[in-house]
């Protein structure tokens, strides 16, 4: 950071992101007294931002909770092994580096030129969930932000025919872990600017050489075009995800359409 203007911008932005993070945590009761929170740190802008916000909140919160940072070294070629340990040591944060060669497995299974992100993320999730259980972690914190949630909603809508996004808090399918997304109310624009001002040592996410998920790229571009025409478009879409009327949809599991009968008419 080079000048006072940047410092002032950082201070203002940090307060803004911290406020949104605290709102999400409070609204969804993400953190409880005595929690042991595992921050999944990839070396990307969002996970750095998540760790910073939780460390700031830890100092101010009326409750006590523990934070550990965990990185999964998947043995991708060119992965800078020293970056995260050096950063976390300087921050004074307890951390663990898990080493698993998932890269070789993914390369063996996925055909050349195809995106490896799906299989890679499933394997990564399983390893991190196992570590959380073995180390008595009560909450697994992920760095997904508002834009990730909106993009996932449209991916499921356009390509899977389902109305589904990313919840701010969930109990894993196997009931072994609780996952939280404290940055759920924070935009990608905010995490990007914050990471640039903080000068985080970013580790590229494409070391594996995988192609981008073209469906997600399409959705992101579409949303950005909408946002250019209407700067509040993403906010309105995000608001809609917490303003759902099951009786106005078509899902018989969410609303009892079958048993609506003439006997219900009141005149």
From Swiss-Prot:
Binds 1 [4Fe-4S] cluster per subunit. The cluster is chelated by three Cys residues, the fourth Fe has a free coordination site that may bind a sulfur atom transferred from the persulfide of IscS. One of its GO terms (molecular function) is ATP binding. It is found in: Cytoplasm. It catalyses: cytidine(32) in tRNA + S-sulfanyl-L-cysteinyl-[cysteine desulfurase] + AH2 + ATP = 2-thiocytidine(32) in tRNA + L-cysteinyl-[cysteine desulfurase] + A + AMP + diphosphate + H(+). Keywords: 4Fe-4S, ATP-binding, Cytoplasm, Iron, Iron-sulfur, Magnesium, Metal-binding, Nucleotide-binding, RNA-binding, Transferase, tRNA processing, tRNA-binding. GO terms for biological process: tRNA thio-modification. Its EC number is 2.8.1.-. It is an enzyme of class 2 (transferase). GO terms for cellular component: cytoplasm. Its main location: cytoplasm. A motif (PP-loop motif) lies at residues 42-47. Its cofactor is Mg(2+); [4Fe-4S] cluster. [4Fe-4S] cluster binds at residues 117, 120, 208. Pathway: tRNA modification. Belongs to the TtcA family. The thiolation reaction likely consists of two steps: a first activation step by ATP to form an adenylated intermediate of the target base of tRNA, and a second nucleophilic substitution step of the sulfur (S) atom supplied by the hydrosulfide attached to the Fe-S cluster. Catalyzes the ATP-dependent 2-thiolation of cytidine in position 32 of tRNA, to form 2-thiocytidine (s(2)C32). The sulfur atoms are provided by the cysteine/cysteine desulfurase (IscS) system. Homodimer. This is tRNA-cytidine(32) 2-sulfurtransferase 1. It comes from Francisella tularensis subsp. tularensis (strain SCHU S4 / Schu 4).
């Amino acid at each position: 950071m080079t000048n006072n203007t940047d410092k002032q911008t950082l201070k203002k932005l940090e307060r803004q992101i911290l406020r949104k993070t605290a709102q999400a945590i409070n609204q969804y009761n993400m953190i409880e007294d005595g929690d042991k929170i595992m921050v999944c740190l990839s070396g990307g802008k969002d996970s750095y931002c998540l760790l910073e916000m939780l460390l700031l909140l830890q100092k101010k919160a009326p409750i006590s909770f523990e934070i550990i940072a965990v990185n999964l070294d998947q043995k991708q070629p060119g992965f800078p092994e020293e970056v995260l340990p050096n950063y976390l040591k300087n921050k004074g944060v307890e951390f663990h580096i898990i080493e698993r060669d998932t890269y070789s497995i993914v390369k063996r299974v996925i055909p050349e030129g195809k995106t490896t992100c799906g299989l890679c993320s499933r394997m990564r999730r399983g390893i991190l969930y196992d570590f959380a259980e073995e180390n008595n972690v009560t909450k697994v914190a992920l760095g997904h932000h508002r834009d990730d949630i909106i993009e996932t909603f449209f991916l499921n809508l356009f390509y899977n025919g389902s109305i589904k996004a990313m919840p701010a808090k969930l109990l894993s399918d196997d009931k072994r872990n609780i996952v939280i997304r404290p940055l759920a109310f924070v935009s990608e624009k905010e995490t990007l600017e914050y990471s640039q001002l903080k000068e985080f040592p970013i580790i590229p996410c494409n070391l594996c050489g995988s192609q981008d998920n073209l469906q997600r790229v399409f959705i992101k571009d579409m949303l950005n075009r909408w946002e250019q025409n209407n700067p509040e478009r993403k906010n309105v879409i995000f608001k809609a995800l917490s303003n759902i009327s099951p009786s106005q949809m078509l899902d018989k599991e969410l609303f009892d359409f079958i048993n609506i009968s003439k006997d219900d008419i009141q005149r």
